[in-house]
Amino acid sequence: EIRIFSRDEKKQDDMRQFYKNPKIKYFIGDVRDRLSIDNAMKGVDYVFHAAALKQVPSCEFFPTEAVRTNVLGCENVLDSAQFHQVKKVIVLSTDKAVYPINAMGMTKALSEKVMVAKSRNLNGSGTVFCGTRYGNVMASRGSVIPLFVNQMKSGQPITVTDPNMTRFMMSLES
């Protein structure tokens, strides 16, 4: 069984219509709400924690919301997973958590620190917390590629914040 836990009802409905698979179960909830996580977490073996506020401007304008989702939400997922004896939780992070210069990177770096600290206190519970950092995934929501393409198509200059900046790109192709 695969469980989808998200606060986005529309995306869940789109997935339900597209996949039409009785082995996929859908749970409406928010990582900020531990009780809704607990409801979905019962009997789960593996968790891929991808919930985040990841748009840099949104996190800059609403840093408290970024902390609530990216840091406290991650803590809720980890606590629930440990309580329900999940085998492994994979926390998805970002390359922007390395030497962060904005609120999104800072909150993701802090969520990684929360994960590492909680890993030290698992006390042989059988649950494992691990994380991975993604760079710019081409064709993903929030990727800089569509912005660059739109700027080129409309004859605008490509916005580069620093000419010495390096961006790492990865594709979903194998």
Please provide the spans of the model-predicted regions:
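Conserved beta-strand scaffold in the Rossmann-like NAD(H)/NADP(H)-binding core
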Residues: 26, 91, 131-133
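Conserved residues in the N-terminal Rossmann fold of short-chain dehydrogenase/reductase
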Residues: 6, 27-28, 68
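NAD(P)-dependent short-chain dehydrogenase/reductase
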Residues: 103-104, 109-174
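Conserved Rossmann-fold NAD(P)-dependent oxidoreductase catalytic core, especially the SDR/UDP-sugar
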Residues: 49, 53-113, 117, 127
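Conserved Rossmann-fold cofactor-binding substructure of NAD(P)-dependent oxidoreductases
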Residues: 17-20, 25-46
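Conserved glycine-rich Rossmann-like NAD(P)H-binding loop of the short-chain dehydrogenase/reductase
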Residues: 1-11
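Short alpha-helix adjacent to the SAM-binding motif of class I
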Residues: 11-17
